[in-house]
């Protein structure tokens, strides 16, 4: 059902993008590719949030947001407080290795509190998902930074002053959702 809808939607987006690309004579292949990847990035990754909601453990949908936001929040504060060693200066000069570790701890803290109150029988699983989710969130954030640098932009928008657009706030969520979905499937198979 819902997986077929996702596949059909992706095929339609790819076809529409190709038709559009062939009809615009001056369209650069790089621009067309970036547009297509951007659409697939948002649609495919965000659809995993819907897939998590369809699982037997739909409460675990919160792990996507807690892992990503716990990572972002704690990485920021730990990085500001004690960050000395640059994580990946050519992509994101303000990120530090200390902040990255703080991000993992933040994800574990947020997801651990959630598990304690909502899924006490799954605390260990939620902690593992928190670590995996945090690492993926940070790679996702760096991948989004690389994409923005390639396109020559600082932020995806300017809706939130100093923070960019909505997509800038949710890029780590988008990367985290598929990984957490597959972690949930793996845990449910055990």
What are these regions (language model features)?
Residues 110-112, 178-181:
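A general structural signal for short secondary-structure boundary/capping elements
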């Amino acid at each position: 059902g819902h997986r077929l809808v996702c596949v059909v939607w992706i095929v339609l987006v790819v076809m529409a993008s190709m038709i559009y690309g062939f009809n615009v004579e001056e369209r650069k292949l790089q621009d067309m590719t970036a547009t297509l990847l951007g659409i697939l990035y948002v649609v495919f990754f965000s659809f995993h949030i819907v897939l998590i909601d369809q699982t037997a453990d739909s409460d675990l949908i919160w792990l996507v947001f807690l892992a990503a936001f716990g990572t972002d929040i704690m990485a920021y504060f730990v990085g500001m407080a004690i960050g000395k060693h640059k994580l990946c200066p050519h992509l994101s000069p303000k990120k530090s290795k200390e902040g990255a570790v703080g991000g993992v701890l933040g994800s574990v803290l947020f997801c651990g509190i959630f598990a304690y109150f909502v899924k006490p029988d799954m605390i260990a699983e939620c902690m593992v998902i928190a670590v995996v989710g945090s690492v993926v969130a940070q790679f996702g954030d760096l991948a989004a930074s690389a994409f923005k640098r390639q396109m020559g932009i600082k932020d995806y928008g300017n809706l939130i002053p100093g923070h960019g657009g909505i997509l800038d706030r949710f890029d780590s969520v988008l990367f985290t959702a598929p990984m957490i979905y597959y972690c949930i499937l793996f845990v449910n198979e055990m």
